């Protein structure tokens, strides 16, 4: 009744590279992405393929540089953060910004009606050509807290 539209979005990859060459992302979601695609096809629901795009993104950045898109920070980067953070699942601001661009590209590829609301200066994004991490600027909030909602 409210005019909403269902869109499936496959999960982002985790940063888990193969042990031998550290060049290929390994699957960590099992059958889940394929199950999503099957349900979407059966129900005629559009699917944004973050699963494939984030694999390309991580593999393009490579084993070491891909850490720059995730919550990988040495101890004492933030107040009250006494231990190093090495989270291969959750994106930092740079990574989240890149993933947001992937979502927009997915919407464009599907030609979803919402794309008409994109800014006129939007520039298309290719996860095989990510933005330079060293050029990315995100100013931390003065009210930052590294405590997880369920505690640390």
Model-derived regions, located:
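Conserved catalytic region of serine esterases and O-acyltransferases that act on ester linkages
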Residues: 63-152
């Amino acid at each position: 009744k409210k005019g909403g539209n269902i869109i499936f979005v496959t999960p982002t990859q985790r940063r888990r590279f193969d042990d031998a060459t550290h060049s290929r992302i390994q699957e960590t979601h099992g059958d889940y992405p394929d199950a999503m695609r099957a349900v979407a096809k059966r129900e005629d629901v559009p699917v944004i393929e973050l699963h494939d795009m984030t694999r390309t993104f991580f593999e393009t950045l490579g084993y070491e540089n891909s850490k720059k898109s995730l919550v990988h920070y040495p101890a004492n980067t933030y107040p009250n953060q006494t231990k190093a953070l090495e989270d291969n699942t959750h994106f930092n601001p740079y990574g989240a910004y890149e993933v947001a661009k992937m979502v927009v590209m997915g919407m464009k590829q599907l030609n979803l009606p919402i794309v008409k609301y994109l800014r006129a200066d939007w520039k298309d994004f290719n996860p095989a050509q990510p933005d330079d991490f060293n050029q990315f600027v995100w100013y931390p909030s003065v009210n930052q807290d590294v405590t997880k909602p369920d505690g640390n």
